Amino acid sequence: WMMIVEQKCRVIVMLAKCFEAGKKKCQKYWPDSEETKTFGRVKVFNADEVKYCGFLRRRFHIESFDENDVCGRVFQYQYINWPDHSVPNTTSNLVRMHKYVIQCLEEIGGDAPMVV
């Protein structure tokens, strides 16, 4: 989260699930919906989670304990239809998620960096 604050990222795109076929694939680095968790000097509140066909969109509010840091809303898009050792059956959900990401970037400022 420190990288998100330092680089002023407003959108995170994630292409992995946390678990696949019973194996851990990615560390869950966010709190559950409507919960707050502190990560070092950054407090993260998961304001909501919306499930779309093939992906999730989470909206976080972040605060830093350093008053010089700029914080606020951060959106996370997590594609959940990519199989572990293969490719998706169709690209339509991934393309749809991409359109949502672009729309989000336009709404919050087109120069917003993205962590992929």
Curated annotation (Swiss-Prot):
<dbReference type="GO" id="GO:0004725">
    <property type="term" value="F:protein tyrosine phosphatase activity"/>
</dbReference>
<dbReference type="InterPro" id="IPR000242">
    <property type="entry name" value="PTP_cat"/>
</dbReference>
<dbReference type="InterPro" id="IPR029021">
    <property type="entry name" value="Prot-tyrosine_phosphatase-like"/>
</dbReference>
<feature type="domain" description="Tyrosine-protein phosphatase">
    <location>
        <begin position="1"/>
        <end position="116"/>
    </location>
</feature>
<dbReference type="Pfam" id="PF00102">
    <property type="entry name" value="Y_phosphatase"/>
</dbReference>
<keyword id="KW-0378">Hydrolase</keyword>
<feature type="binding site">
    <location>
        <position position="84"/>
    </location>
    <ligand>
        <name>substrate</name>
    </ligand>
</feature>
<dbReference type="InterPro" id="IPR050348">
    <property type="entry name" value="Protein-Tyr_Phosphatase"/>
</dbReference>
<protein>
    <recommendedName>
        <fullName>Tyrosine-protein phosphatase 20</fullName>
        <ecNumber>3.1.3.48</ecNumber>
    </recommendedName>
</protein>
<comment type="similarity">
    <text>Belongs to the protein-tyrosine phosphatase family.</text>
</comment>
<keyword id="KW-0904">Protein phosphatase</keyword>
